[in-house]
Amino acid sequence: MSILKNLAKNLGLTNITQPKKKYATVGEKKSDEEKERAKYKVKNIDNLKEDEVTKCPSCGVLSHKSEIRANMKMCSNCNHYFNMSARERIELLIDEGTFKEEDVTLTSANPINFPEYVEKIEKAQHDSGMNEGVISGLGEINGLKVSIACMDFNFMGGSMGSVVGEKITAALERAIEHKIPAVVVAISGGARMQEGLTSLMQMAKTSAAVKKMRLAGLPFISVPVNPTTGGVTASFAMLGDIIISEPKARIGFAGPRVIEQTIRQKLPENFQKSEFLQECGMVDVIAKREDLKATIFKVLNDII
């Protein structure tokens, strides 16, 4: 008889239950944390800090962030495409040592005195290390000189305000000035609501610049990647002479759930994905990320 039961008997107590054993038994369920580790098979996860690890939203595998960066921001398990920053896009597409950034000092004002907009801009600048949501300039793709602009989703969701619209317009006008092709990589949640009509005006402004490119007889390559939506889709992003995208990129105006609730119909499978748009004739080429630079160069070589 256990010590606990002897004590209970001496005190005249009944219904005393011994505490449950705390050590593991055969068939005992694993903790949630142990299940996660077993499921994702992450090596040396105990030695990694939380901010050093990223979980793939597609396959669930945990990977070291440095591994993802070294793999062109792709999951090494399922090839899911993580978003690239504007500078990473520049490094991917432009020959090393040839990029010259333009319009570096342009920053947004607060044209309609939207509450807390200035604070949001400052936070986005601090978090992203950028002045605004697009980087533009001149560079070379396999020796071919181009004017390029790359948007960044990390800066307020890649939203297009007055400065983003101005820098994209300037990139197209710079192409006309130098008589070279223009390449714009679009990734955006749409027009920046904090700037009201000023942001909506950028749709017309950038579209007019595309028209100038066309009148000058110069090629404009648009590269909408995941996600490209709203006013950016409804303006310059879908006006390229050739539109190139990455696999499974979502490109559309409103989100699919909003559309389904509006029309009260089920949307087709892969709706708004780049493959679906290619079937409908709205995207010309789908290129894997590792082939994107070579694809743009080949297209430009063929049409110049």
Swiss-Prot record:
Keyword set, alphabetical order: ATP-binding, Cytoplasm, Fatty acid biosynthesis, Fatty acid metabolism, Lipid biosynthesis, Lipid metabolism, Metal-binding, Nucleotide-binding, Transferase, Zinc, Zinc-finger
Ligand binding (Zn(2+)): C56, C59, C75, C78
GO biological process: fatty acid biosynthetic process; malonyl-CoA biosynthetic process
Recorded GO MF terms: acetyl-CoA carboxylase activity; ATP binding; carboxyl- or carbamoyltransferase activity; zinc ion binding
Signal peptide start-end: none
SUPFAM superfamilies (UniProt xref): ClpP/crotonase (SSF52096)
Subcellular location: Cytoplasm
Cofactor dependence: Zn(2+)
EC number of this enzyme: 2.1.3.15
Chain ranges of zinc fingers (C4-type): 56-78
Subunit description: Acetyl-CoA carboxylase is a heterohexamer composed of biotin carboxyl carrier protein (AccB), biotin carboxylase (AccC) and two subunits each of ACCase subunit alpha (AccA) and ACCase subunit beta (AccD).
Family designation: Belongs to the AccD/PCCB family.
Function: Component of the acetyl coenzyme A carboxylase (ACC) complex. Biotin carboxylase (BC) catalyzes the carboxylation of biotin on its carrier protein (BCCP) and then the CO(2) group is transferred by the transcarboxylase to acetyl-CoA to form malonyl-CoA.
The protein's name: Acetyl-coenzyme A carboxylase carboxyl transferase subunit beta
Organism: Fusobacterium nucleatum subsp. nucleatum (strain ATCC 25586 / DSM 15643 / BCRC 10681 / CIP 101130 / JCM 8532 / KCTC 2640 / LMG 13131 / VPI 4355)
